Amino acid sequence: MQPKVLHTLEFDKVKEQLAEHASSPLGLEKIDALMPSSDLEEVAAWLDETDEAAAVLRLAGYVPLDGVVDIRPHLKRAAIGGTLSPQELLEVAATSAASRQMKRLIAGLYDEHGGLERLFRYADTLAEAPELEHDVRRSIDDHGEVLDAASDRLRSLRGQIRSVEARIREKLESIIRSPSAQKRLSDAIITIRNDRYVIPVKQEYRGAYGGIVHDQSASGATLFIEPQAVVELNNALREARAKEKQEIERILRELSAKVAEQAEPLARTVEALAALDFAFAKAKYARRLQAAKPAVNSRGYLRFLQARHPLLDQEKAVPNDIELGGDYTTIVITGPNTGGKTVTLKTIGLLTLMAQAGLFIPAADGSEAAVFRSVFADIGDEQSIEQSLSTFSSHMVNIVDILRHVDGESLVLFDELGAGTDPQEGAALAIAILDEVHGRGARTVATTHYPELKAYGYNRPGVVNASVEFDTETLRPTYKLLIGIPGRSNAFDISRRLGLDERIIERAKAQVSAESHNVENMIASLERSKKQAEEDEARARAALEEAERLRAEWEQKWEELEEEKAERLAEATQKAADIIRAAEREAERIIQELRRLQKEKQAEVKEHELVEAKQRLAAAMPKVEKRKKAKKAASRHVFQPGDEVKVTSLNQKGYLIEKVSDDEWQVQLGILKMKIHERDLEYIGSAPAKDVTPIATVKGKDAHVSLELDLRGERYEDALIRLEKYLDDAVLAGYARVSIIHGKGTGALRQGVQQFLKQHRAVKSFRFGEANEGGTGVTIVELK
């Protein structure tokens, strides 16, 4: 990029604003060296870096860079054996502390949120020197004074100094309080000259106290004398202070040596802090401008949505949508020379430079910037009515230089192209220059007030007309860019508003050709149509935003309902779990009671006792209503004796024996026979062709309960259901030991069985079978 172009488009002023957000001289140094890049990957990386810094500001709200100083000169001097001053040591410690805090901040956000790869790489190179920080802070206060705590010797020397000073003051106080002092002394004070304590003595009494004269007043009437009584003490004080100075020098040398040990990692830290300060300055500047990260491309396409000039008041700047490099590669902004066109031209150029420098642009999200190899601009700052030949020549020199270098990777900006010479010749030159630049494939934006160029946008493919809207009421440009509509002269309207006689205006209109008059009317009609279309679009956008707002509101309400549903479901689950635990306790109690009856009575347990116990167990189980759909499905089936059914309240399968009433069936559930209401039955299938014989009694070890359960080939869930039922039956049958055959296979079923046995209350212990019992394919269970 040519420095002249950067100055013309005021990129240097953007850098001045950016510099206001740097926290250290390191960041300012980076900003001063900032130049737009023409490398797409580099630009994308710079923008990503700014984006990451903006994310950190959003998440953390601040960055600890205030204490950062350029300590590179300190590090160099320490590395060659120099002694740093207390202030320089404090700056090293402050920079190290800022580095440590910054590293922790970015590392913490990286671990928690991710997506900060570039900043994390900088943070990873930051050195931590907590011991050095501690030593410096322990030895030097915030004002750069070496503290007593820096060393035991320094503390002792300063104690001596304070003691000697106290003795000196005591002696001098006795002198100035003596009766003779009033006439001998100019003032009853103790002061210091040449680092020695003295008193002001009148000239005529110079020999009254002996000692040494160190100074005199301007008039010579007062002598500052060190009385003989304190000469030795002052000598002792000077000696102690000399030793103090030597000790301070030793402490500073020692601290400087520690800095030298850390010089290399601290130098790398400075470079990383410079990059971080620069990145956060860009992010803060973006926040100030309410700027957005643009997408970037190398195909010469730019689309700035709601773009604003960064150097204008962002609250007052008029946003514009600008597109170039898609359907058209040249924009010709026509219309009167009112100033609005130049602002638009500079906005396009400056936003392009900002994006290529890794800065966010003052535009809306969804904006896109092209990365050009070169940006050229011929923009005159003076927009006077009369333009001299020298001005035309100056512009032509710029244009000749542009034409010498322009290519398909260039953005070219012409302000008032062809102005400053004969209008007819100037318009012809402007058209020829635009044709040349357009033919080379460059992206071009040109402003002109020549009416001849209005037709240019209609006659050339890839070229579009545009204008800056002018408010005839206020006689000012609105700065609103109208793409597709050429500018029109507002001379008659402006003259009328300013009070020019209507007769003169009508005579002037008569001088204008009918063709020109028709063109002006057509342009005015286009402006009205575009304005109406924009108003319609604004209303549609407002309606869409309202719909989006309502959708977001309902989504939030839906999420709240889902959360409430989840909470209630959790409560219900907890209640169900409590009920199930109570049911399990009741089941255990019933089983224990049955076993006690069998052992104590040594008698048959009648069927009605088992049925009664099972019904008590069923009563203890939680009642869960089934879905209406399931009820309807069940009610549609006409139950028949022998049907296989599921008792939903017990979660047990069985067979229908007979219907005992209009809505009750007798159901065979394993060894039990129960009366179940029809609504509690769920049809599974027809029974196999075999007799269903009710079991009348259970005696001791029932013959219908096998001593082993074969689960091989069963699905995992079904196997555990069968295992649970089998263990209940085995307990009721009074078995002390049973065998569970699960096979070896993958071991999943074996593990599931043994995990289930660990939690079953009736299981006393279990083990794998011996070799003659089936080995690891069988689990032997001891029941309580």
From Swiss-Prot:
Keyword Isomerase recorded: no
CDD domains from the UniProt entry: ABC_MutS2
Protein name: Endonuclease MutS2
InterPro entries to which the protein is assigned, alphabetical: DNA_mismatch_repair_MutS_C, DNA_mismatch_repair_MutS_core, DNA_mismatch_repair_MutS_sf, MSSS, MutS, MutS2, P-loop_NTPase, Smr_dom
GO molecular function: ATP binding; ATP hydrolysis activity; ATP-dependent DNA damage sensor activity; endonuclease activity; mismatched DNA binding; ribosomal large subunit binding; rRNA binding
Alphabetic keyword roster: ATP-binding, DNA-binding, Endonuclease, Hydrolase, Nuclease, Nucleotide-binding, RNA-binding, rRNA-binding
Annotated Smr domain residues: 709-784
SUPFAM superfamilies: DNA repair protein MutS, domain III, P-loop containing nucleoside triphosphate hydrolases, SMR domain-like
Subunit structure: Homodimer. Binds to stalled ribosomes, contacting rRNA.
Chain's role: Endonuclease that is involved in the suppression of homologous recombination and thus may have a key role in the control of bacterial genetic diversity. Acts as a ribosome collision sensor, splitting the ribosome into its 2 subunits. Detects stalled/collided 70S ribosomes which it binds and splits by an ATP-hydrolysis driven conformational change. Acts upstream of the ribosome quality control system (RQC), a ribosome-associated complex that mediates the extraction of incompletely synthesized nascent chains from stalled ribosomes and their subsequent degradation. Probably generates substrates for RQC.
UniProt: ATP binding residues: G335, P336, N337, T338, G339, G340, K341, T342
Domain of life, source organism: Bacteria
S-adenosyl-L-methionine among keywords: no
Similarity-based family: Belongs to the DNA mismatch repair MutS family. MutS2 subfamily.
PANTHER family referenced in this protein's UniProt entry, alphabetically: OS10G0509000 PROTEIN, OS10G0509000 PROTEIN-RELATED
Coiled coil: none
GO terms for biological process, alphabetical: mismatch repair; negative regulation of DNA recombination; rescue of stalled ribosome
Annotated EC: 3.1.-.-, 3.6.4.-
